Structure formats: structure tokens, C-alpha cells
């Protein structure tokens, strides 16, 4: 793994690290501005936008990623156009549906009728679609510094707009929703202007709209199932316990989102690098095995530290959201297992074996729904967190299993699973008990165990990177 590769990773990630610092400032302020109920409403609106985006995109954003490097550079604008063609058509249909069913949508979210909700959803859909592809363009061109710039700009603008709209709306969901909308709008417009060459849609693509859709549509179904897996928890919490618990759950996710920023930094860097590496040498496995090892070590250490620091969440979120500190521990597994799985599963995409994505998505979606239906009525948001955390471990295991069926990777899984057992027990303890001394002691023991189990990996990383040696 060469120094230039690491430089590229840190260039992609630097925006995430700055965003974490911004988040540490903005999250405590935001949670003190809004009650859990209003936070919950904003979260449900965001959830609906994400659902509709799955329908609108038809998986063609993934098609753009898959065929980007196989397309001639001068024709990538046309590839972008072909990937946007069907989503734009579907977007207009969805907009008509939102207008027609606006009363039902408003009743579901607010328990009263407000056409304003329909306008917000329409605006957010338009700019979220444009933002997804404008971000992908920068990401696939591997313009790391520009990507980091927009990551930071989005966070800064979002925070500033929250402060602005709070003066107008006070404790109201509109404060967060409008801040998200306007920050997305500005960064999208700027990124399209900067990348105007590819957005001119020029050239003759090697791939037809039908060919792109044929590849992407199965992924769209998989992504829909993945959404059910990832988001059914909030819907079930709303049905069984109400907006207060949704707000608590969403606040706990705000803490996890700070880890997810690092996750996004890695996955943004990793996907194009991995595809490029595979296209040059499909038989190369050592590179992927080493990345798996290093990423596992980093995220396990980070996860144990976050769990050990759980009591700081009370200070961070404020007394109103104190229950979120009991929800957060099991949610830690979401970014950890997702990120580690990204290092093992890309071969499924390489080999175009999308049926495995479908099998995985159906399995984990069903498991999470069953887990939530059993645990949420009894434990509320904590039950949803337990279900999600456990199912994400299954998610990682299945992704890795099918990947290793396609290529004979030699991932060192035993030591990862050993640490996961102890981390899972630790997280469950923190979900139900809050003894400060035991929290710290158990956390330190877990960190020591990680360092012992991964000692050979730590030594290897030291000599390769600290000593500035290359593979």
C-alpha cells in the first residue's frame, strides 16, 4: 500500500474529521433547541425522503459508479445523462403523488394537515437527487480535497442555517428540515458549477440507458430491502411508542453519525480505489486482505473508545436526551460492521453477482423487522438499537461469506469475531446499567484485548507506515 494511496485516503477523510469537530459543537446546541418530539418529526421527514429516493434513483447511482471507469473520459457526461434519464422521469411522477396524497402524508407525520410538508418533501427530493450524483462525480474523479471541502461546507452551512431558522421557528421541526434543505441546495449548485464539464452531458456513451437500467434495477430492489433493514426501526418505534422515543433514538444516531462521518470518508475513498485496483489485477487478494485487517483494527479500537465514553453523551446531548445514552451502545455496531464489510464485499460487485446482495438484504431486513417487533414494544428505542446492532453483525458475516465464495480471500475472521463477542457483551451491559467505574474498567480491558489480539497487525502497520516503508 503506497504512500500516495494513504495520502488520497486522508485527503478524502479530512473533511470528515473537520465535520466531527463541527458536530461536537452543533449537536449539543441542536438538542438543546429542540424537544425529542420535534427531533422525531424531522427524523421521520428525512426517512420519507430516503424512501422516495430509493424509488426515484432506481439504483442508477450505483450504475454510474460501476461503469464510470469503463467509460471513455470524454463520454462520462453522457453516461451521467443516461443515469439521470429515468430518475428524472420517476421524480416527476413522485412529485405528482406527493401533491395528490399530501393530506395523508401530513396526517402521518404531524397528525394534522399541512400542505407545507408536501412542498418540503418535493424540494428535498429534487436537491437530494442532484446532490447524490454531483457528489458521485467528484468522488469517482477522486478529487479528494474538493470532496472534503464540500463535506465541511455542508456541515457549516447546516449549522448556520439551524441557528438562523431557530430564531424564526424556535422549537419546531422546520428548524432542522429547512437547514438541511438549504445547505444541500447550496452545495449541490456549487458542485454542479465546478464540475460543469461533465454536467454538460456531452459525448457518446458506450452504455445505453437500457443496459444501465438492467444492471441497476436489481440493485434498486436490494437497496429498498436494505432501507427496510436500516430504517424499519424508526417506523416501528413511531407505531408502538410515539415521536418522543423516535426523537431519543434519532439523537443517539446523531452521536453514531459522528463515527459514520469517518465511515463515509473511508467508503468514499475505498470504492473507486478498489474498483480501479481490481480492474488492473483481478487475481490480487493480498491488498484487500490487508485493508480488511487495518480497517478492522481501527474501527474496533474506535468503537470500544466510544462505548467507554458513553457517559459524555449526557453532557453532549443535554438532560432532555439522557435516555439516548442507553440507546447508543448497540448502535455503535452499525458504522463498525458496515465499514468493515465494505472491505470484504466489493468482489460481489466486481463479479456482477447482484443476486447475493438480494439474498443478504432479504435476510437482514426480515431479521431486523422481527427483532424490532419483538423488542420495541417491551424496550422502546433500546430494543430497536439491540435489534439493529445484532443484525448488522449478521449483515457483515453474510457479505463476507458470499464474497469469499467468489474469490478465495484469506481474511483473518477468527480474531475479529472474538473481539465482537466481548464488544457485544460490553454494549449490552451499557444498555441496561450505568456504573461509571465499571464502564471505564470494562472499556480499558476491551481495548487491551484488542491490542493483544491485533498485536501482529499493529507491528506490521508500524513498520510499513511509521517507518515509511512500502509493501
Regions found by a protein language model. Name each.
Residues 67, 127-150, 199, 332-363, ...:
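Membrane-interface junctions at transmembrane-helix termini in multi-pass inner-membrane proteins
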Residues 81-110, 163-167, 189, 288-338, ...:
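Alpha-helical transmembrane segments of multi-pass membrane transport and lipid-handling proteins
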Residues 119, 149-197, 363-367, 381-402, ...:
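Hydrophobic alpha-helical transmembrane segments
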Residues 409, 430-471:
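Membrane-proximal transmembrane or re-entrant/amphipathic helices at the cytosolic face
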Residues 56-72, 140, 256-293, 345-350:
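Helix-loop junctions and terminal segments of transmembrane helices
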Residues 4-61, 90-99, 124, 155, ...:
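Signature of the first transmembrane helix
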Residues 1-5, 145, 173-179, 189-230, ...:
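Interhelical loop/hinge segments that connect adjacent transmembrane helices in multipass membrane
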Residues 8-23, 154, 176-191, 195, ...:
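Transmembrane helical elements of multi-pass membrane transporters/channels
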Amino acid at each position: 500500500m503506497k504512500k500516495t494511496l494513504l495520502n488520497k485516503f486522508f485527503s478524502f477523510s479530512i473533511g470528515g474529521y473537520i465535520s466531527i469537530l463541527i458536530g461536537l459543537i452543533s449537536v449539543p446546541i441542536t438538542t438543546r433547541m429542540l424537544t425529542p418530539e420535534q427531533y422525531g418529526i424531522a427524523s421521520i421527514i428525512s426517512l420519507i425522503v430516503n424512501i422516495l429516493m430509493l424509488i426515484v434513483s432506481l439504483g442508477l447511482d450505483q450504475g454510474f459508479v460501476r461503469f464510470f471507469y469503463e467509460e471513455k473520459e470524454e463520454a462520462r457526461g453522457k453516461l451521467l445523462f443516461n443515469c439521470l434519464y429515468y430518475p428524472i422521469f420517476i421524480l416527476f411522477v413522485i412529485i405528482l403523488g406527493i401533491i395528490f396524497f399530501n393530506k395523508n402524508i401530513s396526517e402521518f407525520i404531524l397528525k394534522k394537515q399541512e400542505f407545507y410538508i408536501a412542498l418540503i418533501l418535493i424540494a428535498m427530493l429534487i436537491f437530494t437527487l442532484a446532490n447524490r450524483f454531483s457528489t458521485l462525480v467528484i468522488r469517482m474523479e477522486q478529487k479528494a480535497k474538493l470532496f472534503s471541502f464540500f463535506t465541511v461546507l455542508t456541515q457549516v452551512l447546516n449549522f448556520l442555517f439551524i441557528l438562523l431558522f431557530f430564531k424564526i421557528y424556535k422549537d419546531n421541526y422546520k428548524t432542522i428540515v429547512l437547514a438541511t434543505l438549504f445547505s444541500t441546495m447550496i452545495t449541490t449548485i456549487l458542485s454542479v458549477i465546478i464540475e460543469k464539464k461533465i454536467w454538460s452531458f456531452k459525448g457518446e456513451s458506450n452504455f445505453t440507458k437500457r443496459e444501465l437500467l438492467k444492471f441497476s434495477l436489481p440493485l434498486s430492489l436490494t437497496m429498498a430491502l436494505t432501507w427496510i433493514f436500516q430504517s424499519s426501526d424508526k417506523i416501528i418505534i413511531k407505531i408502538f411508542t410515539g415521536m418522543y422515543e423516535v426523537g431519543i433514538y434519532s439523537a443517539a444516531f446523531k452521536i453514531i453519525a459522528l463515527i459514520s462521518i469517518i465511515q463515509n470518508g473511508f467508503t468514499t475513498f475505498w470504492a473507486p480505489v478498489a474498483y480501479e485496483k481490481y480492474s488492473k489485477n483481478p487475481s490480487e487478494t493480498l491488498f484487500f486482505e490487508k485493508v480488511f485487517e487495518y480497517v478492522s483494527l481501527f474501527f474496533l479500537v474506535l468503537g470500544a473508545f466510544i462505548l467507554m465514553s458513553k457517559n459524555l453523551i449526557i453532557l453532549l446531548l443535554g438532560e432532555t436526551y439522557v435516555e439516548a445514552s442507553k440507546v447508543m451502545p448497540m448502535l455503535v455496531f452499525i458504522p463498525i460492521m458496515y465499514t468493515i464489510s465494505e472491505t470484504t464485499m466489493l468482489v460481489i460487485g466486481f463479479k456482477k453477482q447482484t443476486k447475493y446482495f438480494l439474498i443478504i438484504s432479504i435476510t437482514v431486513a426480515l431479521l431486523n423487522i422481527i427483532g424490532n417487533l419483538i423488542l420495541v414494544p417491551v424496550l422502546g428505542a433500546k430494543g430497536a438499537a439491540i435489534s439493529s446492532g445484532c443484525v448488522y453483525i449478521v449483515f457483515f458475516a453474510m457479505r463476507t461469506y458470499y464474497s469469499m465464495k467468489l474469490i478465495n480471500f484469506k481474511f483473518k475472521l477468527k480474531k475479529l469475531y472474538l473481539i465482537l463477542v466481548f464488544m457485544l457483551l460490553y454494549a449490552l451491559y451499557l444498555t441496561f446499567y450505568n456504573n461509571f467505574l465499571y464502564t471505564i474498567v470494562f472499556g480499558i480491558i476491551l481495548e487491551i484485548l484488542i491490542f493483544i489480539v491485533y498485536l501482529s497487525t499493529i507491528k506490521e502497520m508500524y513498520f510499513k507506515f511509521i517507518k515509511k516503508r512500502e509493501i
